[in-house]
Structure formats: structure tokens, C-alpha cells
Amino acid sequence: MTKRCSWVKMSNPLYITYHDEEWGQPLHDDQALFELLCMETYQAGLSWETVLNKRQAFREAFHGYHIQAVAEMTDTELENLLENPAIIRNRAKIFATRANAQAFLRLQAEYGSFDAYLWSFVEGKTVVNDVLDYRQSPAKTALSKKLAKDLKKRGFKFTGPVAVLSFLQAVGLVDDHENDCEWKSGH
């Protein structure tokens, strides 16, 4: 029998696929990084399952997460999204998506890519943590606090240290798969 992290909701195929094919895999594509950063910002105060179930609708609402297109969305376009029942209709989170796209573009201009900026925080190598049980893992770390502080300084929204740690785990900068999970680095 396949051994996954115990947080995976086995009743939801999207959850299983997300864990098996995406979560914790080192990611270097800026557009994919932007999408996952946005998803983590939407999660604030909600369950990950809620966000995952609305993922496709968010992609459609935000131009497939094409960063430039999102950065150029008008207030009217964003206001119209508040009428879309397929997404999380939180005004602050919707407007934060545009603000984060704009901040993302500034980082790309400065570093050549968001990927280069992000991976510089871990010297290009995934941090592999010893995780016996995810429920005993910290909600934030020194790394997530440092990155969250820098992102905030650069104009990002909804990127506190808890959301940032979830993002770092999702995009493979931090491997927090449980030790007995088949997807754990070196397992």
C-alpha cells in the first residue's frame, strides 16, 4: 500500500494528486510559482481543500495566472470577480492577487526571475526536515519569517510567515513530507 503524508485527504482525488504530483516537488517555473503563491494567500482563514477545489476557477478568473495580465487587471475586473461564486469572493484577497503580480514583476526585473530570488534564501538547495508527524511541525520557521518580512517590504500581501512556510513546502524549497511518506527526499 502506498504511504503518503497523513494530512492527505484520501477521499478527495484532487488532494491525492496534489500531494503525489506537486507538493514538495522543487519548482522553478515563475508562472507556476506565482499560482501557488496566490493559492496560499487565498487559504488564509480557510482549509486547503477549499482552495484546491476552486483552483481551476481561480485560474480562469486570473488569466491562467499569466503574471503580466494579472498585474494589469483593472479595479472593475477585480470588482466583477466578487460576483463569481466559483472562487473565494474576498475583496482583500482578490485585490492582493493583482498587487502580488505587480510585486512579482518587480522582483523578476531585479533578480532575473522570481525563482532566482526565492531559491537564494536556501542557497539553491531544498531544506529537508525530520517530520515524524505533520501535526508536530511548526507553523512558521526562521526561514519563513525572513522571507515573509522581505516579501512584505517589497509590497506583497497576505504573505505572512505561516502562508510563506506553506508556500515553501508546496514549491519544494522545504521538504516537510513525513519521514515514512514515499515522496520524502531520499526515501
Which residues does each predicted region cover?
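HhH-family (HhH-GPD) DNA N-glycosylase catalytic core used in base-excision repair
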Residues: 1-187
